[in-house]
């Protein structure tokens, strides 16, 4: 009872966001899709990881999550590259939670130099580098076959400017219980996907399937069947942009009977592991 009272008193003295109860340690992993490449991952140890947070203007994001406070207390923010549909809401989310935005090193250098975020919220790391952004959580940056640029409106001129976004990456996210998630970011096919699968052995792959800017259904099916061979795939990066026309149905048809379980979530739906 005394412990509960201390928690309640602390909440009364803290900002609204931090008065929310901490995510309970359930021993399970919950993966909530928020549209495009944005996910809210609740870890077995009670941490919350948010990837590629483009939410406010994302046509697929459920209305409740367009308010960033609805995500609750966020412990780790991961951004795969500088394109707006992956980076847009990351700075605000970092400031709101006072946690770093982890992104490719050269991208974060640009974000810091432009004053978008203060230096303590833009740590640098790069491909093959492994960090521990929260106790029990390991994140390794791996190759992605894409591009990256930051488009920023200069407050002095009111004009958009293009700035270096570093090299795009994917992330191997290892949780407290050893469960590994491969968030591929935006990528086309590259044969080192086979190496990533052999070396990191991901249990779950978050895979772009929309095409035009990333792998389409046929390419994604080839990567799944021939190189990655994961237990489970959640399709992502489709439907938010009219050019990303690939669908989970097309992907699953191209994949056939591969032994991989495909979970085509709707925005706002979650899978539990």
Swiss-Prot record:
InterPro entries for this protein: Metallo-B-lactamas, RibonucZ/Hydroxyglut_hydro, UPF0173, UPF0173_UPF0282_UlaG_hydrolase
Molecular functions per Gene Ontology: hydrolase activity
Gene3D superfamilies: Ribonuclease Z/Hydroxyacylglutathione hydrolase-like
Keywords noted in UniProt: Hydrolase
Signal peptide start and end residues: none
Hydrolase keyword on record: yes
Disulphides: none
Family to which the UniProt record says this protein belongs: Belongs to the UPF0173 family.
Protein name as it appears in the record: UPF0173 metal-dependent hydrolase Bpro_4324
